[in-house]
Amino acid sequence: MTIPEKPQGVIWTDAQWQSIYATGQDVLVAAAAGSGKTAVLVERIIQKILRDGIDVDRLLVVTFTNLSAREMKHRVDQRIQEASIADPANAHLKNQRIKIHQAQISTLHSFCLKLIQQHYDVLNIDPNFRTSSEAENILLLEQTIDEVIEQHYDILDPAFIELTEQLSSDRSDDQFRMIIKQLYFFSVANPNPTNWLDQLVTPYEEEAQQAQLIQLLTDLSKVFITAAYDALNKAYDLFSMMDGVDKHLAVIEDERRLMGRVLEGGFIDIPYLTDHEFGARLPNVTAKIKEANEMMVDALEDAKLQYKKYKSLIDKVKNDYFSREADDLKADMQQLAPRVKYLARIVKDVMSEFNRKKRSKNILDFSDYEHFALQILTNEDGSPSEIAESYRQHFQEILVDEYQDTNRVQEKILSCIKTGDEHNGNLFMVGDVKQSIYKFRQADPSLFIEKYQRFTIDGDGTGRRIDLSQNFRSRKEVLSTTNYIFKHMMDEQVGEVKYDEAAQLYYGAPYDESDHPVNLKVLVEADQEHSDLTGSEQEAHFIVEQVKDILEHQKVYDMKTGSYRSATYKDIVILERSFGQARNLQQAFKNEDIPFHVNSREGYFEQTEVRLVLSFLRAIDNPLQDIYLVGLMRSVIYQFKEDELAQIRILSPNDDYFYQSIVNYINDEAADAILVDKLKMFLSDIQSYQQYSKDHPVYQLIDKFYNDHYVIQYFSGLIGGRGRRANLYGLFNKAIEFENSSFRGLYQFIRFIDELIERGKDFGEENVVGPNDNVVRMMTIHSSKGLEFPFVIYSGLSKDFNKRDLKQPVILNQQFGLGMDYFDVDKEMAFPSLASVAYKAVAEKELVSEEMRLVYVALTRAKEQLYLIGRVKNDKSLLELEQLSISGEHIAVNERLTSPNPFHLIYSILSKHQSASIPDDLKFEKDIAQVEDSSRPNVNISIIYFEDVSTETILDNNEYRSVNQLETMQNGNEDVKAQIKHQLDYQYPYVNDTKKPSKQSVSELKRQYETEESGTSYERVRQYRIGFSTYERPKFLSEQGKRKANEIGTLMHTVMQHLPFKKERISEVELHQYIDGLIDKHIIEADAKKDIRMDEIMTFINSELYSIIAEAEQVYRELPFVVNQALVDQLPQGDEDVSIIQGMIDLIFVKDGVHYFVDYKTDAFNRRRGMTDEEIGTQLKNKYKIQMKYYQNTLQTILNKEVKGYLYFFKFGTLQL
């Protein structure tokens, strides 16, 4: 169908217009970052409805996430409603408003689930199936692998024995089990998993495939050997310019002769390479040689570096690719074939048994969704089924978003329900292969690349390709820098796609013309003499300074109004490859009081509150685990002190378990009686919880622990209380989810948690920060995909690529299969096989390619300005970086494949042709926009030494002044003088705050307000606070005289803390028995009973308030809290006083869903003549109004609910607030 002519004045670019209307064949839209692909996709759907009259439920729209699906459906629904309002008589539009709710705009998994629900009879499964949780799936798969391995241990096939000896250790078979698990996940990402597993052995048996692998390694070796020869020749040329280096030249001449033989005839002579030694040692560069070439010091160093580079490149070929002769590599393949075949058999057994278990439990996982859908849509010969044909008739177009993240199974499903071939099909695909960063989820970017290379711009004879290259997100400096980097870094060899004119980004956003250069910051670490911080901590502190600089100096441009506003916290994001730097950043931002949030799915199990609950669960499951038992004892719940634990252990130093030591201590006559009682209560708790866990699910056990010990309340009152509370509820909810699976019990739940921790999986800290909250954010590049921020700080660039998987004994690859090292069982030695070497080389190339794509995603998140943060150890590392500058179109393939981290790649590109002669002892700034080559982007490269970075002042351009500018300052600059005077005259605006303590009790706040109202200075209250003693009165003073009033008050509060609330009021006799019990338990002293005002307590027991509490649903006693005063005072943003309130609430109860607090008062007061009870009550309320206000606001802040309160005076009665 012909694309309609684009009218004048429409907002769409030509490429977007084509993307909206192109039809009649399969269409692939290569949509670069920020090119408006979502808007185009929505507009295409709308035009299908409005222009072509297609019903919305006859379109299948596939998105990558459920969130994307909801957002897209919402956008489409809005547009339909707008069109319907504009044309109310249009019956077709009215129908669409109804049909939008049945429209298939979803993830492919959701579509597959719907397919299964409608056609379960084809699969012969129970229609009442449910989807298994991740917990259930992990445990069931682990259980299946264990059982299958045990079965094969019974068989003891020779190939199985060899496998276990190769892949297991003397202590465990964890590695063997992990490989089986990985193979399972790789296999089910294919349309026919069994067939994929069967083909794993083919390269080990067929010589033709082995020859292909040899050729692959030979071609790759040629790249490195050619680069090595170039480096060798450069070293020779440099040494030839010098005096006194004849011996050096002789060594290099010999190496050149050897290399010439290897490269003779344009081919790589691998046998000659493996048979001879290369890289002879160069003679030392003596002081005499340096003196003779004193004018060529840099050239001398460069010559040595070039020879070092030559050696490293040759070593890589000889060590990584051809450490053994090709014939030996082939011979090992034949011996490995039975092991590979048997390993595939084990995985097939796991797959079969795992499927059987899932069917018996009537559960499905996400892999089942895809494979069952494929089973419904295909016949046994792989051709589309009748059901597939019906879907082909129903769906008039299939639209796929994020096509670059599709896998082979999903591709097969789409091919079953699409119509026609590529030249006349109805499949519309949108994506950007440069943003394919989900290979760990088995995404296969080659599907996109194959179509991109096959489809044409005009679509003649095949599918149509449309390039959306105009970026509407970023300033031109961000785009030109991104283009410049990737023009030199990415091509088909490394990166898997050519970054040419069609792939690059074109400026399309309506920004003004102001200058916003990209900033590349190179941080040189301070050594231990200059800083106690690690390199990572130094980088974190430096990032904070960059944030402060942005907040003070940068503005955000509003495209709609054409005006600027000040930068805020939420405008800034810090992107990293992983969350490894999160803790350092959190601490650094905390030190500067900058609101900061880590958008993390990691670190959950490291949170204090979560570790406490897990220690509790582990101790209940098995108290013989010392770490968890002692951890629970030392926690805020039980509060055993270190010296108490020492006493216990000293008495039984040879016990195997601390639990045994506790029991022995309790039974020892010489033991401290108070500690024995404390231990008895602790063991009683443990035994009680153990008994409870036998009859109740895990989530109820956790809930009981929370309620018994006020865990939620305690952690809610700490700094970060909202997040801590969310974490605790998150663990509770996970326990509920776990209990809803087919697994039960505390042991299984702990096993599940251990499995997640071992695999590096996290629930993630519960997110309590919304998208509009004004905080600086840190997130991984993966989680930032699809988002945009005015200011992006891309840090962690110097962190090395994670190549851990390349060191495993088994390398997996979707295209090639399985590469296994050869293990000589007799010699117990492992050797690289042809397959393991070749697949490792392929995996390394794919890994670096994906890391490049991650860099692309990170750079293209920035709207206003981009900051790139690299870090080097010292000046020597900086000098080596300078040597990386390139002069060609691309960085050499070998340089890219061996680059340790993104920073090496980025710096080598952006520092191209830059002078390395600036003195190292000066901070400097190199603006590569000033270089004559006009194609260069606008980038500032700054070298910063950490010891020069002040963590108290903001780094600005003054930190990088040239020598001339410094001289001008010395001669006297009026601006500088004015600045100095301004700083000396500066008056600190918050002087009063320096006189206030950072932490105050509620009682102190009450005194503060009372003194302010009476005209007394706060300093006197502060002096009172400092002088007030909280230590207990020594026994010798207690024994000599009566208790003081405040001590009696404390005693009365202690009695009330433990007082039972019964619907049938306790009698005076029972009260005496209860107090005797407190004495027996050493809660109060033996002589305290005489000072307890029994009559006043009985008056309370007979009061209405006692009855109300006795009938309450929940009662909590003596609740401590710590809360930010700004939150309690509900201060506006920016007026927050950094002051913490701490206190203790006597009692809280919940009745009819409402929370009430009670505060007991032992005050003595004089009843003035003629004063009524009402007047006395008003006077008492006024006296404590400040304190009660803080209690009420604190609880409302913590609970997020309305709270009411009571004051109870033992000498007056009840006052309701």
Swiss-Prot record:
Cofactor(s) it depends on: Mg(2+)
InterPro entries according to UniProt: AddA (IPR014152), DNA_helicase_UvrD-like_C (IPR014017), DNA_helicase_UvrD/REP (IPR000212), P-loop_NTPase (IPR027417), PDDEXK-like_dom_sf (IPR011604), PDDEXK_AddAB-type (IPR038726), Restrct_endonuc-II-like (IPR011335), UvrD-like_ATP-bd (IPR014016)
Binding site for ATP: 31-38
Keyword Protease: no
Annotated GO CC locations: cytosol; DNA helicase complex
Coiled coil: none
Known EC number: 3.1.-.-, 5.6.2.4
GO molecular function list: 3'-5' DNA helicase activity; 3'-5' exonuclease activity; ATP binding; ATP hydrolysis activity; double-stranded DNA binding
Function: The heterodimer acts as both an ATP-dependent DNA helicase and an ATP-dependent, dual-direction single-stranded exonuclease. Recognizes the chi site generating a DNA molecule suitable for the initiation of homologous recombination. The AddA nuclease domain is required for chi fragment generation; this subunit has the helicase and 3' -> 5' nuclease activities.
Descriptive protein name: ATP-dependent helicase/nuclease subunit A
Primary gene name: addA
